[in-house]
Design a protein with these regions (language model features):
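Positively charged, aromatic-accented nucleic-acid-binding surfaces
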Residues: 2-14, 21-80
């Protein structure tokens, strides 16, 4: 699969976009910048995260295979 934003990851795993962003924030992969937009942290970049190339409002994206497994592991460790 390709790179996906929170909206498409949410669709793939059956969760809302807000839920995905919340989990990514809890995982330390993204933060809100001074303008209130999502931005990657160093940890997010270290696992291959990139900002989308949108001129309107770039968003964090990850390779689905990578982020899916990390989300499953995080959920099993922290959210049960």
């Amino acid at each position: 699969m390709s790179r996906m934003s929170a909206r498409f990851v949410g669709r793939a795993v059956g969760m809302s976009t807000g839920w995905v962003y919340g989990m990514w924030k809890d995982m330390g992969l993204i933060i809100k910048d001074k303008f209130g937009d999502w931005a990657l942290t160093e940890a997010g970049r270290n696992i291959g995260g990139q900002m989308s190339k949108s001129n309107h409002c770039p968003v964090p994206t990850f390779k689905f295979e990578t982020i899916e497994q990390l989300m499953i592991d995080f959920y099993n460790e922290h959210r049960k």
